[in-house]
Structure formats: structure tokens, C-alpha cells
Swiss-Prot record:
Source organism of this protein record: Cupriavidus pinatubonensis (strain JMP 134 / LMG 1197) (Cupriavidus necator (strain JMP 134))
GO biological process, one term: butyrate metabolic process
Record's protein name: D-(-)-3-hydroxybutyrate oligomer hydrolase
Primary role: Participates in the degradation of poly-3-hydroxybutyrate (PHB). It works downstream of poly(3-hydroxybutyrate) depolymerase, hydrolyzing D(-)-3-hydroxybutyrate oligomers of various length (3HB-oligomers) into 3HB-monomers.
Domain of life: Bacteria
């Protein structure tokens, strides 16, 4: 679609002429004005519409305001065992907003970004509450098993003369409010925001009680929910009842256990959210014909649409732009996207004119590599001052197991950990990510992601316990236990869709010494060593190249989630933190830039912005000691990317070229959460004409990033 500064006099004249021609040719009975009815997309089910006044409740902060979002006091439900839908919504917005951005004043919240900072970057005295309406519905393929949540927010400030919309597909494996902090940009601009949980979600199917979540997060029994369940697990070889009798207290999560490999459809679901958004906008603002039928007054050609989000949501936005055959998307602005290139893309990535050690690998490839090596690498002497560093006997034991399996070398723990860190470098992690390995290890990040994606790609049932893993709440003895009713009742709001989350942990069901046991403290059966389940990590890794039925199923799933690289000439900005330790730039945004040039050539309008001293989890900046000293918020650069793409689409202003942005860490005492206040000088703008030393060069099949 093309937008000429919202001036469409020529289009209007053409439309008028077309209407006259239709009448002259006897086209249609328009005597009642019902010429273009606003038909709800066929995939959309029952729609719930809720208005929010912008005072007691609102679209962005659920009535909490800027101060409420920043408060450490969560808006817990009045009756924790039976929260209302409204309470769960408020709690979900609070939790998910704080999971994406740093909400500390020292980190820039309230001064450089946040609800009280307006669309022009001015700090206001208000709380940033935004009145408007929400449209909520499932998208389904007719089976009642897909039930992807769709949500559209339309602020009361929506400008019908300059209509706009952005997408905010959920990040990670989160629920529909997972990217509410991204939606903030659109709401402030008076744009509609189209959200989707993309077939993932935070609330589990509790197999003990056989209860499941509904679309609003409230829970009921599986039989009572029927096809209205947001997610209900299906059995594998065993029935769910037989499985639970043998293996009690387990939980099934939609991303891991839906048996649908939802990632293959993240682009489709994002496009469906846009279509739902267009319908909702016209349901609200379309003219009504004399026969009472609402019309599609604001056609998609009149609405500026930017696909946006972060992490998995950012990858979904890129996928949607690639798959957009109907002109739904005008531009793309994403941060730290999960991008999987085809193994044969053969993109050469260079840093400082020197080829990097590895690039363009699939997420499942590098996350299973991290799952083997990262725990040991976190013990490296070079990382003793890194955030969350601590000597860990389980990780030290992992080092020895890696040596025994000839994956690293060394006779001392120091040498072994250094070897593991070197192996991560050889696998494509940049040295700037080194300081992140201890904290990512602490949260068992690589294991939880590897297990989730292995199950998803292989379309495994929860009853399959792929590689001997399951999900369950644990108590002080680290063994599976019944999840507390109050915790389960609020997991729609508090969970992130993968363990560890809300007391739920990853379980090693093959620990012969303890029985089922929390993964990070468990014993490998192959060596009777408490090495945080090396056996499970190796099993997950072997699925990538194995030949048995489970490995073949996983490899088939992986083949379905790869990008094409063709954005069809859409203006696009990708921002990514150079230090990202979860989705390393060498495997994601850097090679995608080259892949896009390979596919589009001179037609490409993609720019890539690499931000120094930025990493994947902005929320950790104010929460984990040591992050605030080292890292700046990438979220601020997503805001700037959205500004740039919007300006390009509405005024024709050129997008900034690909570049490295040289930020300045806040500094201060090492490993505190109270670094000096983030100032504008710490986070310089994206340059319209970067110095030569900061320019990223891209050509067909090649990318060169300066040091």
C-alpha cells in the first residue's frame, strides 16, 4: 500500500468516478447504501467488546497508571483462588509490561519512555492512562483446538482522517497482553493496536484437576470448557487420566504441548490480527447504511499498518510481512526478533571485515548448544564479576561431564569453564554476551527454551515426556507437587508460558537417584552425576540430527518455521542489542539483513540498527544486580524505530541507514541495581547519516558490521 501523507484527493476522485461507472453499468443495488458491508473475518469467533474510561480502567495500564506499573506491589486479586476476568486482565497488563521494560526511574522509565512520556517524547505530569475499547475473540480453523487469542485496542483518540494501526504479537511464549509495552507506542499515537498470543499462552492445563484456561484467563474444567478452552492438552500414547495416575502433578503448556507447532503460523496469526483490527475499526467507525448494516468505510488501503513487536513477536511481525500477499502491512519495526534462516542461505557475516565464527544457525541449533555448554561456561574465572555469578557445584559437575564427552577440554574447573566459553564463541556468541551467561544459567533459560521448542517442533504430547522432561510445580524438596490453587488461578497473568514460571519448574523424569526432580539440581542416569541433567541436554541436541521418529518429527517441524527473507519492498527497521545472549545477533538480525538483500536486491528497504550495550531482557536492568551498570534499554530504540517507520510512511522521510549505535553504559559501582540515572547522552539517537566507522554494509549474501 502507498500513503501520500494521508492526502488522497486523487484516490477520492477515482473512487467517485468508479461509483458513477458502477451506476451507469447497472452494478449492484445500492439504494440502501449497503455497498461494502463490514464482514467479520470467517476465522473469528464470538467477539466481546469492552469500553474503558481512561480513569478507573484503561487500555494501557488497566487503571494502574504509570506509578502503578512501576510499583513493586502487584494488583493481586481480592480472592486469589477465584479471580475475576477484570482482575486477571489488570494483573496481566501489570506483569507483562514489567516483563518487557525496565520500570525503574533510574533506568529511564518516566523520563525517556513510559506511559507519561507522550508520542513526541515530552514528559507529562499525567499517569498515561488511555481510554478506548477492546475487542476480544478467538481465531480458529474450525477444529476448536487452535483458538488463537486476538485482541484489538482502539483508543478514543483514534483519528479517522489519519487512521493507523500497529501489531503487538506476544513475545516469548506469553499470552495476548505479552507485548502491551509495544502497543503503548500505537495507543499514544491514536493508533489501533492488534495483539495476538500467536498460539502460545501463560496459563496451563492442570492435569491433576483437569482444568483449563478460557479466553479471559478464568478457569474451568476441560469438559465444561469444550471448544471454548484457550488450551486443552490432547493425549499421546496414554490417555490424560492414565498419564496423571502414573505421573501426577504435571502441567501442559500451549506452546510446548498443543501438538500444532504454532511457530509455523506466527506470521499468519499476525496477519489475522490485522484483519480483525480492520474489522474492529470499521465496527466502531464505519458508516451505517439505511438498512442498518455497518459499512467498511475505512478500507485497508486507508490505514497505515506497521508490523511490530519484540523477540518472538518481532519474528512473527517479520514473518507476517514476508507472507503478506494482500497489502495489509505497510512497514515493519521490530526489536531483537527471533529469525530462523534456511540452513542453505549461506550468508557471510563479518565483523570488522573478519568473518565471524558462526552465523545464521537455527534457534534450535544454537539453543541446544547453549543448553549443553552455558552452565559450565558460567563458571569461567573471567566472569566472576558478571551479574549473578556464583560458584555452583551442579555447573562444575556439568563441566566434568562435558570433558568426559569430549565436548570441551581442561583438567581444572577454571580451564574447563574457559574451554566451554570458547566453544560458545566458536558457536557464534559475541564476547559482549559473556557477562550474561551466569544470569541466563541461573534462570535455566536455555534448558526451558530447548525443551519447549523441542516439544513444539516434534508436535509431542504432554504424555510423551520428550527426552524425559515434564513441567510441574515443586516444593522445597525439588520434587513435583500439586500446584497451589491460588497460583494456578492467576497464571494467565503471572506466567510466561515456559518454566521456570510461577513456581512451575522443568522436571527431569529420568533421575534414578531422586525420582522426578527439578532439572537444574538433578542427576544424569548415564553417569550418576549431579550435573543438571546432561543426559536430557544431549538428548535434545541429538534430536537435531537423529534418525528416529521423534527426531524426524522435530526436523520436519523445524523446516516449517524458516524465513524467506523477502519483505516485498516494505520499509523496515530491525533493532537488536549487540550483547544479546539469548538470540545472538550472529544468528538472527545480522544474517537476515544479508539474506534480505540476497532475496530483494536493490528493492530492499530494510535497515538494521545494532545497539551497543543492549541485551535481550530490559526488565533485568532494574531487577538483576549488575545489569544497570552495563546495559541500556533496547526498548527505547524500538520506539525510535517505530517513529522512523511511521514518519517514512506518512511524510516520506528517509529511513536511517544500517548502523551501529554507540551507547554509553551508566557505570557506577559494579553489580548493583542503583547505577547512575540513565541520561540522553547514554542513549544517542539513530543517526540519519552515521559516521563511516558506524556504518553496516550489506550486499547480496554478505553483511559487514564494524567493531
Amino acid at each position: 500500500m502507498h500513503h501520500d501523507n494521508f492526502r488522497r484527493l486523487g484516490n477520492a476522485a477515482f473512487a467517485a468516478a468508479a461509483a458513477l461507472l458502477a451506476v451507469a453499468c447497472g452494478g449492484g443495488d445500492s439504494s440502501d447504501g449497503n455497498t461494502n458491508p463490514n464482514i467479520k473475518p470467517a476465522n473469528i469467533g464470538t467477539v466481546t467488546i469492552q469500553a474503558y474510561d481512561g480513569a478507573t480502567d484503561d487500555l494501557l495500564t488497566a487503571g494502574l497508571g504509570k506509578d502503578g506499573l512501576a510499583s513493586a506491589t502487584a494488583p493481586v486479586p481480592a480472592s486469589p483462588n477465584s479471580p475475576t476476568a477484570a482482575e486477571l486482565r489488570r494483573y496481566a497488563i501489570y506483569t507483562n509490561y514489567r516483563a518487557i521494560v525496565d520500570t525503574t526511574a533510574g533506568g529511564g522509565f518516566g523520563s525517556l519512555y513510559g506511559p507519561n512520556v507522550d508520542a513526541q517524547g515530552n514528559v507529562t505530569t499525567g499517569q498515561g492512562k488511555i481510554a478506548g475499547v477492546e475487542y476480544l475473540a478467538f481465531s480458529d480453523d474450525g477444529s476448536g483446538q487452535e483458538n488463537v487469542t486476538m485482541l484489538v485496542q482502539i483508543p478514543n483518540t483514534f483519528n479517522q482522517s489519519k487512521p493507523c494501526m500497529i501489531t503487538a504479537t506476544s513475545s516469548g511464549s506469553r499470552g495476548v497482553y505479552g507485548a502491551i509495552a509495544v502497543g503503548e507506542w500505537g495507543l499514544k499515537r491514536g493508533c489501533a493496536v492488534a495483539y495476538t498470543d500467536k498460539g502460545t499462552g501463560a496459563a496451563p492445563h492442570d492435569l491433576d484437576t483437569d482444568t483449563v484456561p478460557l479466553i479471559d484467563g478464568t478457569r474451568t474444567t476441560r469438559s465444561a470448557a469444550g471448544t471454548n478452552a484457550q488450551f486443552a492438552a490432547r493425549p499421546g500414547i496414554l490417555s490424560l487420566a492414565d498419564f496423571t495416575a502414573q505421573v501426577p502433578h504435571r502441567l501442559a503448556f500451549k506452546h510446548a504441548h498443543s501438538q500444532r507447532n504454532p511457530e509455523k503460523d506466527w506470521g499468519k496469526f499476525t496477519l489475522q490480527a490485522i484483519e480483525f483490527g480492520i474489522w474492529a475499526i470499521n465496527d466502531r467507525f464505519g458508516t451505517v447504511a439505511s438498512n442498518g448494516v455497518r459499512q467498511r468505510t475505512l478500507a485497508k488501503s486507508k490505514i497505515v499498518v506497521i508490523a511490530s513487536s519484540v523477540s518472538n513477536g518481532g519474528g512473527a511481525a517479520v514473518a507476517a510481512a514476508e507472507q503478506d500477499t494482500d497489502g495489509l502491512i505497510d512497514g515493519v519495526a521490530v526489536a531483537e526478533p527471533n529469525l530462523n534462516l534456511p540452513p542453505n542461505a549461506s550468508i557471510l557475516v563479518k565483523r570488522g571485515s573478519k568473518p565471524v565464527n558462526a552465523s545464521g544457525r537455527l534457534l534450535y541449533d544454537y539453543i541446544t548448544t547453549a543448553n549443553l555448554l552455558q552452565l559450565c561456561a558460567s563458571q569461567a574465572t573471567a566472569l566472576v564479576n558478571a551479574p549473578a555469578f556464583a560458584t555452583n557445584q551442579f555447573y562444575i559437575s556439568r563441566c566434568q561431564t562435558l570433558v568426559d564427552n569430549k565436548l570441551i577440554s581442561g583438567t581444572t574447573v577454571s580451564d574447563q569453564a574457559a574451554s566451554a566459553l570458547d566453544q560458545l564463541h566458536l558457536a557464534g556468541w559475541e564476547p559482549e554476551s559473556d557477562a550474561l551467561h551466569p544470569s541466563l544459567s541461573l534462570f535455566d533459560t536455555a534448558a526451558s527454551i530447548a525443551v519447549t521448542y523441542a516439544n513444539s517442533y516434534a508436535r509431542a504430547s504432554v504424555t510423551d515426556r520428550l527426552c524425559g522432561y515434564s513441567f510441574a510445580a515443586t516444593l522445597a524438596d525439588f520434587k513435583p507437587a500439586a500446584i497451589a490453587p491460588s497460583v494456578l488461578a492467576s497464571m494467565f497473568a503471572t506466567g510466561n508460558g515456559v518454566p521456570p514460571t510461577s513456581t512451575v519448574q522443568l522436571i527431569n523424569d529420568r533421575d534414578l537417584q531422586h525420582g522426578p526432580f527439578m532439572n537444574g539440581q538433578s542427576v544424569s542416569a548415564s553417569n550418576n552425576r549431579a550435573d543438571a541433567n546432561f543426559d536430557g541436554a544431549k538428548c535434545l541436541r541429538d534430536l537435531l540430527t537423529g534418525t528416529d521418529s521423534q527426531a524426524q518429527a522435530l526436523q520436519s517441524g523445524v523446516s516449517q518455521i524458516q524465513r524467506s527473507g523477502n519483505l516485498h519492498g516494505k520499509p523496515a527497521l530491525i533493532v537488536h542489542g549487540r550483547s544479546d545472549g539469548l538470540l545472538p545477533v550472529n544468528h538472527t538480525s545480522r544474517p537476515y539483513l544479508g539474506f534480505n538483500r540476497q532475496q530483494e536486491g536493490a528493492a530492499s528497504k530494510l535497515s538494521y540498527i545494532e545497539v551497543e550495550n543492549a541485551q535481550h531482557f530490559d526488565a533485568f536492568i532494574g531487577a538483576v544486580s549488575g545489569y544497570s551498570n552495563r546495559y541500556v534499554p533496547l526498548h527505547l530504540y524500538l520506539i525510535r524505530a517505530l517513529d522512523a517507520v511511521y514518519d517514512n510512511l506518512t511524510t516520506g522521510k528517509a529511513l536511517p541507514p544500517s548502523q551501529v549505535v554507540r551507547t554509553i553504559p551508566r557505570g557506577g559501582a559494579t553489580n548493583t541495581t542503583t547505577a547512575p540515572t540513565l541520561l540522553p547522552v547514554n542513549v544517542p539517537p539513530i543517526s540519519a547519516s552515521p559516521d563511516a566507522a558506524n556504518q553496516i554494509a550489506a550486499s547480496t549474501g554478505s553483511v559487514d558490521v564494524p567493531d
